[in-house]
């Protein structure tokens, strides 16, 4: 199974490569151990999955045909075409770690950013419910049920606004 790490563009290494660069603007890609991507791509097996991952091991592309890839700035690994590997996608939620395709492990900073995004989304959703209910109350058009609903959504909104994104504990959303 092929595994080409940290593929970067570099200078041609032979006269033939130099001529191709000069005549056709070919960009040469080299793995960290000096392997030529264009030669190595021929060695990938047709019955495997090819995974491209970044410097943080996050999967950024998946294909069965290595010749379709432009791996500059990434690493490429070949893995067996088995169910567990086929579950992965390039959504950013998967990684290649310790020789295996696994669900992504988020850093504490990433988890906090996700919590901040979720907090903003929940507050926005609450405001969308609260606004028409407030209007109904202000115009003396609200039913008792709408007044009670407004109060529960306002309480929820306050509780969400107090959530610490570093250690989120989300309140239950009203019905």
From Swiss-Prot:
InterPro entries, alphabetically?
Phage_T4_Gp38_tail_assem, TFA_Chaperone
On whether Ubl conjugation is a keyword of this UniProt record, the answer is no
UniProt key word Secreted? no
Keywords tagged on the record: Chaperone, Viral release from host cell, Viral tail assembly, Viral tail fiber assembly
According to its UniProt entry, the protein's GO biological process terms are: virus tail fiber assembly
Query: Pfam families under this entry?
Result: Caudo_TAP (PF02413)
- Highest taxon in the source lineage: Viruses
Describe the family membership recorded for this protein in Swiss-Prot or TrEMBL.
Belongs to the tfa family.
Instruction: State the function annotated in the UniProt record.
Output: Acts catalytically in the formation of tail protein dimers.
Task: Give the protein name, as stated in the record.
Answer: Probable tail fiber assembly protein
